[in-house]
Amino acid sequence: MPKLKTRRAAAKRFRVTGSGKFMRRRAFHNHLLDHKSPKRKRYLGTMAVVDERDHDRVSHMLPYAG
């Protein structure tokens, strides 16, 4: 069987934890930040876990990620 190709766009957007979960960045932390509170901006800067319903989709895009 040939090697599977990794979707490069997904490889740049997701990271795998030690337990095999996928982490992603949060939205709304790119621009238009003046009116957002510092607390909200700190929260948006943290990583989030990909929902379990999307786990299979992400794992197909990243065949060698854990």
Swiss-Prot record:
The terms under GO molecular function for this entry are: structural constituent of ribosome
Question: Signal sequence: where?
Answer: none
* Keyword annotations: Ribonucleoprotein, Ribosomal protein
Q: Does the keyword Ribonucleoprotein apply?
A: yes
A GO CC annotation recorded here is: cytosolic large ribosomal subunit
- What SUPFAM superfamilies does the record point to? L35p-like
Protein's name in the database: Large ribosomal subunit protein bL35
Q: Which source organism?
A: Synechococcus sp. (strain RCC307)
The record's gene field reads rpmI
